[in-house]
Design a protein with these regions (language model features):
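Conserved, short, structured surface segments that act as functional micro-motifs
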Residues: 194-197, 215-257
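Short glycine/threonine/proline-enriched tight-turn/helix- or strand-capping micro-motif at secondary-structure
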Residues: 112-131, 143-176, 199, 244
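Zn2+-dependent peptidoglycan hydrolase active-site motif and core
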Residues: 176-210
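Short aromatic-glycine-enriched beta-strand elements
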Residues: 152-162, 189-195, 236-238
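Long, low-complexity, acidic/serine-threonine-proline-glutamine-glycine-rich intrinsically disordered tracts
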Residues: 69-139, 144
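Alpha-helical oligomerization segments with coiled-coil/rod-like character
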Residues: 1-91
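Residue-level recognition of beta-strand microenvironments
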Residues: 145, 185-186, 228-231
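Generic structural motif
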Residues: 134-144, 172-182, 222
């Protein structure tokens, strides 16, 4: 009788192990696809930023050439006017020509270059390392840390977390950790996911039930992005990632506690 009971316990444990493994494999597959989508969108954003940088450099080059050309023409015109009127009003023409020349020489193209804005934003984001607000409203607990971790209940099985999981209270909302631009909003596995660009830094907010921003929108620090959905266990859990271009960073060293 005892042997039969022991066998039943073993069978039950094996059954639970198989269920846990199946659930884990499903979760692993979902996260692999999600991260592949995030990687692709971030690569596209990096490529777009590089195109903008090159286009701005070309615009500046052309504007500088045009400025120099105009300045050269004005110098030539001023010299011609001085020569023409030298006999009648030499001093007056010289002053006028010099004034025109000086005014044009100090005039430079007026640019609001997004590349310069990106660089400034990247610098200010980096300067706030360790001081960024938590990306979730209300009280919270970090339930899964960055990097590899052992799966509870499965001996020797590890998963690799590209960010951190933050569990909050029911009704918790995701919020931007810094000012930036919403560059992507996409749905995956029934949940919304948002990418916000802060210069060369990107923050990713996953597992949202709804969103309250749109693509291309400028957001401020602590601005609500959407409501956090419940995970498989019924908890409101936000998956949060931080990247510097393609490099994955540990968010915990950047967030204030």
């Amino acid at each position: 009788g005892q042997q039969k009971e022991r066998q039943q316990v073993v069978d039950e444990l094996n059954k639970k192990q198989k269920q846990l493994t199946a659930s884990l494999n499903k979760q692993r597959k979902i996260y692999a696809h999600l991260n592949a989508r995030i990687d692709k969108l971030i690569q596209e954003e990096i490529a777009a930023a590089e195109r903008r940088r090159k286009a701005e450099a070309e615009r500046r080059r052309k504007a500088e050439l045009a400025r120099q050309r105009k300045l050269r023409q004005q110098r030539e015109q001023a010299a011609a006017r001085r020569k023409q009127t030298a006999s009648s009003s030499k001093n007056k023409s010289s002053r006028k020509g010099k004034n025109n020349y000086d005014a044009e020489e100090t005039a430079t193209p007026d640019f609001t270059a997004s590349h310069d804005v990106d660089r400034a934003l990247s610098g200010s984001f980096a300067a706030n390392r360790g001081r960024l607000p938590m990306p979730i409203t209300g009280s919270y607990a970090i339930t899964t840390h960055f990097g590899q971790y052992n799966v509870p209940g499965l001996r020797g099985v590890q998963l690799d977390n590209k960010g951190i999981n933050i569990t909050g209270r029911p009704g918790a909302q995701a919020r931007s950790v810094f000012r930036g631009e919403v560059t992507a909003i996409f749905a995956y596995s029934g949940m919304y996911n948002i990418i916000v660009r802060h210069g060369s830094y990107m923050t990713v907010y996953c597992n949202l039930a709804s969103t309250s921003v749109r693509r291309g929108q400028e957001v401020s620090a602590r601005q609500v992005l959407g409501s956090v959905a419940k995970d498989a266990s019924g908890n409101c859990t936000l998956h949060f990632q931080l990247r510097k271009e393609t490099t994955k960073l540990n968010p915990e060293s950047w967030l204030a506690r």
